[in-house]
Amino acid sequence: MESVAKPATTKEGSAKQAAIVVGVLALGWFAIQVAFIPLFNKVRGGGSDKKDDDVNAFTPDT
């Protein structure tokens, strides 16, 4: 007789399964974000990869 895993039918099993699914979805979303950062930046209009420190410098209005 072959041993087959039973589906989670208890509240504890269901909560654990839901936590695993949410964790996997979050990890997948994060991986996609990291993988496509250069593409997302170009689509948003930040096509230049060069850092311009003068643009981010604080200049008070006096």
Curated annotation (Swiss-Prot):
Q: Where is the protein found, in the record's own terms?
A: Plastid, Chloroplast outer membrane
Membrane topology, Chloroplast intermembrane segments: 1-17
Give the main localization category. plastid
Q: Which key words are in the record?
A: Chloroplast, Membrane, Plastid, Plastid outer membrane, Transmembrane, Transmembrane helix
Q: What are the transmembrane regions?
A: 18-40
Side of membrane Cytoplasmic, spans:
41-62
Q: State the source organism's domain of life.
A: Eukaryota
Topological relation to the membrane, as annotated: Single-pass membrane protein
An example of a Gene Ontology cellular component annotation for this protein is: chloroplast outer membrane
Question: In its UniProt entry, what is this protein called?
Answer: 6.7 kDa chloroplast outer envelope membrane protein
Q: Which organism is it from?
A: Spinacia oleracea
